[in-house]
Swiss-Prot record:
InterPro entries: KRAB (IPR001909), KRAB_dom_sf (IPR036051), Znf_C2H2_sf (IPR036236), Znf_C2H2_type (IPR013087). Residues 2-73 form the KRAB domain. This is Zinc finger protein 58. It comes from Mus musculus (Mouse). Gene3D superfamilies: 6.10.140.140, Classic Zinc Finger.
Length: 489
């Protein structure tokens, strides 16, 4: 026969101790409802003592204490000597005291890590066993810890109960809110002992530490590139498979992972909360503001050891350094030019092949990269909705406007000519100073730009990498090939 305890919610003493007042209200309502159903069916032979307490409708914490007393009759309250907190279970008092003293009596036999209670040790052991007992019914994703599943389920419901008082942004977990708050406070509690660099989140700190160890155990079978994390390898492998599953609804641009899509979508929103105090320019991300501020300070802290070239950020330096490394760079088989990433090499190779796989259905114009196509399509609408606040000039897209705005930002003090980036401005300023730092080892001729030197060196090698498909004539420069192709058209 069905009894009350067959349908009751059976909490362990530890679980009961952790319930909040509103959770106890829910617990009480469900327990009483279950009992009323049994009573209606004539299956409740006698009223359990716990139900009697719950029917008194006392405050949830009174119910909690009395319910615990009902389940464990005759047990006295166990009180912490140093603090006023009391526990019905002695095991909970012991666990509480270990937290205060820092004692960690439960040790993992696999790796030696110690914990102050058995449940934390059990959760930790699942790292070694790979066990993930808590599964999401919505998407099938599994978790080691029940609380992680609860946080994950908010992704499906859209619930974000934790709100930042500073900017109003909401989060699905308290830990994410705590990490976000550090943007406002500037707090960086995780410091690298190796180089002294500090981080606001534990995950970025751990990721950084792998730079010092140099360990990259996850290798791409396609191009032999190595990664510190399996997730990074997985994202990278989509480059080879051309799989871009995550598409922006605003402009149609596809991405390899949801994180990149989310980051991209901020561009479409008008919100730019991070403003430069020096010039008033606003940014979507704090990292972009920090990098921009180095322009005003004239700082380029990240210097290349191989060629003395300096950069505003370590990301730009790392990308540049691949050019010097034969192992990590991507070499063009046609002209020998090296690139820091595989997509850059692919894009470059289309100059040799003349391939333009992305076609506009409206006018038939073709493009070598997919990113140009959505912006081109805006020109057919005839609308120029984006206005430059500096000069009033109108543009079809935010991309065109941003490209134009850089001309106002990077201006030559000598002739007031504008440039799209700092590197182009620096190269131009050498026209006024007469500086030519790039010298040809073959003939001693010097150049103001590195790309001019690279093109000049083809004269010595006799190499003409740019070939006309119509007549077979070869050229040193892509610009010369384009000019020549006008003869055939």
């Amino acid at each position: 026969m069905l009894s009350f305890w067959d349908v009751a919610i059976d909490f362990s003493p530890e679980e009961r101790e952790c319930l909040e007042p509103d959770q106890w209200d829910l617990y009480r309502d469900v327990m009483l409802e279950n009992y009323s159903h049994l009573d209606f069916l004539g299956l409740a032979l006698s009223k359990p003592f716990l139900v009697t307490f719950l029917e008194q409708r006392q405050g949830p914490w009174d119910v909690k204490r009395q319910a615990a007393a009902a389940v464990h009759p005759g047990k006295t309250v166990n009180k912490c000597k140093d603090f006023s907190k009391a526990f019905f279970c002695k095991s909970l008092l012991t666990q509480h005291q270990r937290i205060r003293t820092g004692e960690k009596a439960f040790k993992c036999e696999e790796c030696g890590k110690a914990f102050n209670n058995r449940s934390n040790l059990s959760e930790h052991k699942r790292i070694h066993t790979g066990e993930k007992p808590y599964k999401c019914e919505e998407c099938g994703k599994a978790f080691r810890i029940r609380s992680k599943l609860s946080t994950h389920q908010r992704v499906h419901t859209g619930e974000k109960p934790y709100k930042c008082e500073e900017c109003g942004k909401a989060f699905n977990s308290h830990s994410n809110l705590s990490e976000h708050k550090r943007i406002h406070t500037g707090e960086k509690p995780y410091k690298c002992e190796e180089c002294g660099k500090a981080f606001s989140t534990r995950s970025t700190y751990y990721r950084h530490q792998k730079n010092h160890t140099g360990k990259k155990p996850y290798k791409c079978e396609e191009c032999a590139k190595e990664f510190s994390y399996p997730s990074l390898l997985k994202v990278h492998q989509r480059i080879h498979s051309a799989e871009k599953s995550y598409k922006c609804e605003e402009c149609g641009k596809p991405f390899y992972c949801p994180l990149l899509l989310k980051k991209h979508q901020i561009i479409h929103s008008a919100e730019k909360p991070y403003k430069c105090a020096e010039c008033g320019k606003a940014f979507h991300y704090p990292s972009l503001l920090k990098r921009h501020q180095r322009i005003h300070a004239g700082k380029k802290p990240c210097k290349c050891k191989d060629c003395d070239r300096a950069f505003y950020s370590s990301a730009f330096l790392k990308r540049h350094q691949r050019i010097h490394s034969e192992e990590n760079s991507y070499k063009c088989g046609e002209c020998g030019k090296r690139f820091c990433s595989f997509p850059h090499l692919q894009y470059h190779q289309r100059f040799h092949s003349g391939e333009k796989p992305y076609k506009c259905e409206q006018c038939g114009k073709t493009f070598s990269t997919l990113s140009y196509l959505p912006w081109h399509k805006l020109r057919h609408s005839g609308e120029k909705s984006y206005k430059c606040e500096k000069c009033g000039k109108m543009f079809y897209s935010t991309l065109d406007l941003k490209k134009h705005q850089k001309i106002h930002e990077y201006k030559c003090g000598e002739c007031h000519y504008g440039f799209p980036n700092y590197a182009a401005l620096t190269a131009h300023q050498r026209v006024h100073t007469g500086e030519k730092p790039h010298v040809c080892e073959q003939c001693g001729k010097d150049f103001s730009r590195i790309d001019s030197l690279n093109q000049h060196q083809l004269v010595h090698t006799g190499e003409k990498p740019y070939k006309c498909e119509k007549c077979g004539k070869c050229f040193y420069r892509s610009s010369s090939l384009k000019r020549h192709q006008g003869i055939h058209s």
